[in-house]
Amino acid sequence: NQHITKGFVIPREIFDNYLFEKAAAVTETLQGFSVKELVYENSRIAGVKGETKEGQEEIFKAPMIIGCDGANSIVARKLGLYEMDMENTAVAIRCYYSGVEGLTDQIELHYVKEVNPGYFWLFPAGEGKANIGIGLSKNDAKKESRTLRQILDEVIQSDYFKDRFMNAKPMEKPVGWNLPLGKSHRKNHGDGYMLLGDAAGLIDPFTGEGIGNAMVAGKYAMQVASESKNTGDYSEKAFSKYDQLLWDEIGKELRTSTKLQNLARSNFLLNFIINRAARNEEVQEIISGMLSNEIPKDELSSPLFYFKILFS
């Protein structure tokens, strides 16, 4: 069997819990605590202030704060680094369905007129369930007269999908969220702090995927934090190593994905690539390899790539 598993589709609540259990096994944790403010001493960050689930105010002191608190990061807001501008943000809506026909072990990305520019995803989630949703730029969403929910309904009721959703039922209310894209190199560190994941705006502009870059950020942040603990240096200069390591690894791909996002806005170019892929297995493998990170995405923005497609 030459089929190789490139990844897994797993609900966030399950995967997040898996990660939390791993963390809880090696450190002290506190659940139900909401950070409200940063604590400063001598103009430097010295901890956080917040509330427990019982409503009790508490302060935790630390020589460094690592903000992994998502797209609506309180840490980034309090530092004045929160960015959710129209140009560098996408919006998405997701819903789990049961009874969707034609599911396989393959993820599906559909570039359809109802979501142009943007795409509709359909991911198998096991036990006859599917994770479906749409994503598009905040700029494009603002120009829409339709809500994201209306667009999603239009897609599943369209001629192309209506048979697959004939007996399908939503398992929840659709959930929407903002996606801070890694189209620009945002400030992610300073004296006594580092920002990771969505809090640092690391989402891939082309695919909308963020967990991979967030985990890369976690790897380098822990490396630098460990070094700082040994040296006692928690300065912006010391933490600049985190930024350098992170962007040396993901910067080129994020820049390429930004170019690809712009290219995908061209219906002519998108249809050209997809039509060639439909007729040519080699082109299919090239595109699949790029989506699964087996082939560098920068090849997709190279003129040589289109030469290959044209003559494959």
Where in the sequence are the language-model features?
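Conserved N-terminal/central alpha/beta ligand/cofactor-binding core
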Residues: 1-37, 286, 290, 297, ...
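Short glycine-enriched, charge-decorated loop/helix-capping segments at active-site entrances
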Residues: 3-7, 81-83, 138, 210-212
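Alpha-helical hydrophobic/aromatic positions enriched in membrane-embedded helices and signal peptides
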Residues: 3-4, 55, 61, 190, ...
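Electropositive phosphate-/nucleotide-binding environments in soluble metabolic enzymes
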Residues: 9, 13, 87, 145-146, ...
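Predominantly flavin-linked oxidoreductase catalytic cores and closely associated redox partners
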Residues: 17, 21-167, 180, 185
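Generic secondary-structure signature for well-ordered alpha-helical cores
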Residues: 24-28, 80, 84, 98, ...
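FAD/FMN-dependent oxidoreductases across multiple families
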Residues: 37, 140-224, 228-230
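C-terminal helical "tail/cap" subdomain of flavin- and related membrane-associated enzymes
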Residues: 226-312
